[in-house]
Every structure is written in C-alpha cells, then in structure tokens.
C-alpha cells in the first residue's frame, strides 16, 4: 500500500518511462491531474489504453483542497498512482502533496520522467547558465503580477538565461502563448521603464517540447511577437550573456539573426 507519483513526460503517452508504466499497471487505482501542464500530443483515452486501466482525472480543487479526502484514504488501503505531466516533483504543488501524504502515514515514491528543465537544452542554451525561472501569469482585474520581470532583471545582471513558464487555466481550456507572454511583458516594461524587456530584446520560444518536431525560434521581440509558433504548450526564454556556441546554435537551429554572433 503506497502512493506513487509518476511523471508522464512532456508530449504524448509514450513519454512515460518503462518503470513508470509498469508501476502504473500494477496499481489498484489511478488518479491524474493536468492543470499544472499540458500533454499536447495525446488524450486521456490513449493514456488509459496504454496503461490498461481507467484514470480518475482530478481538478485543481480536488488536488489542492481535497487530496486528504480523495486520494490519501485510497493509498492507505491499496497501491495508488498519481500521474502528472512532466516530472512529478518539478511542480511545487506535488512536493506539498508528498508532505501531506507522509503526515498522513502514507508511504510514497517518485518515478521521474522527461521535464522541461532538461528539454529546454534543445534550444542550444547551456543548462548551467540558467538562473531562477518564473511564470508569466494572466493579469486579472485588480491583480497584475510583475515578479517575473524582476527575475529577468536579476538573471540578466548575472549574465544568466531566464526560463519563463506560461500561465495555464486548464478549467477554461486557456493556455498562454509566447505571443501573449511577450505582450504582457511589454506592458510591464511600460509600467517599470527599466529597459529589461523591450522590442529589441532577444528571446527564444520553444513550443511542444518533447515532440519529434518541436518549434524552436529565436529573434527580437518586435519580430517574434507576430510569429505563429503553433499549438501550445510554449515556453519563453530570455537569454543572458551568450557563449559563441550558443549563439551559433540559435542561428543554425532557431533562425536567430546572424548579427547576434557579433555580440559574443
């Protein structure tokens, strides 16, 4: 009797590891949440078909407010799988769930899977040069968060790249595009006027990471904001100081303007 946090990877049902698949198949009950990320290349039916068992999909409210009522009682009596997109422990929500499981006396295990934190290397930007990441959230009435702007500023001062996750409103089937994120960041720039994110800022967009044909594009905001990057999920990267190999990679594989080679 235990709770297994199992990652599904980034794109489709085939991204789950062999260990994760075997574990899910032996579990007596399977729950899943998809409000922290999106698997664009698959469906719930295909995941169920691969595992061979029905999956109970949980909402944000189910997970964050009723985990002790819905999932933990089951895990005290049988083996239970909790499926998540990406790697289970990347989302802070899931770390909290594991703490709650331990406090309830439920043994838990983590089975890793491909994560955006590793997949972002397909852009050619060196992983060790990434600083703190942040999420660009949709502004709402009387609420316009800007902390991600400050994260970009802090990272750039140290020459580091910034990985920006884009807001998800799964219950509304609303997934922020890189274009929307750039528009929001330009609005914040208009408010703060610190020259951190302008039409001349170099950005990198990675769409559908984990697929065989992800979209990787690099260029200046003034040009990129009008591009079509295809289906979500998207992530936006604001590069810091580029190494010559990083710049060459962006030119060759992401269509970056060759003039960036003159700046390294």
From Swiss-Prot:
Its EC number is 2.1.1.98. GO terms for biological process: methylation; protein histidyl modification to diphthamide. Pathway: Protein modification; peptidyl-diphthamide biosynthesis. The keyword Transferase applies. Keywords: Methyltransferase, S-adenosyl-L-methionine, Transferase. It catalyses: 2-[(3S)-amino-3-carboxypropyl]-L-histidyl-[translation elongation factor 2] + 3 S-adenosyl-L-methionine = diphthine-[translation elongation factor 2] + 3 S-adenosyl-L-homocysteine + 3 H(+). S-adenosyl-L-methionine binds at residues 10, 87, 90, 115-116, 166, 209, 234. The keyword Transport does not apply. InterPro entries: 4pyrrol_Mease (IPR000878), 4pyrrol_Methylase_sf (IPR035996), 4pyrrole_Mease_sub1 (IPR014777), 4pyrrole_Mease_sub2 (IPR014776), Dphthn_synthase (IPR004551). GO terms for molecular function: diphthine synthase activity. Homodimer. S-adenosyl-L-methionine-dependent methyltransferase that catalyzes the trimethylation of the amino group of the modified target histidine residue in translation elongation factor 2 (EF-2), to form an intermediate called diphthine. The three successive methylation reactions represent the second step of diphthamide biosynthesis. Belongs to the diphthine synthase family. PANTHER family: DIPHTHINE METHYL ESTER SYNTHASE, DIPHTHINE SYNTHASE. HAMAP family: Diphthine_synth (MF_01084). This is Diphthine synthase. It comes from Thermococcus gammatolerans (strain DSM 15229 / JCM 11827 / EJ3). The gene is dphB.
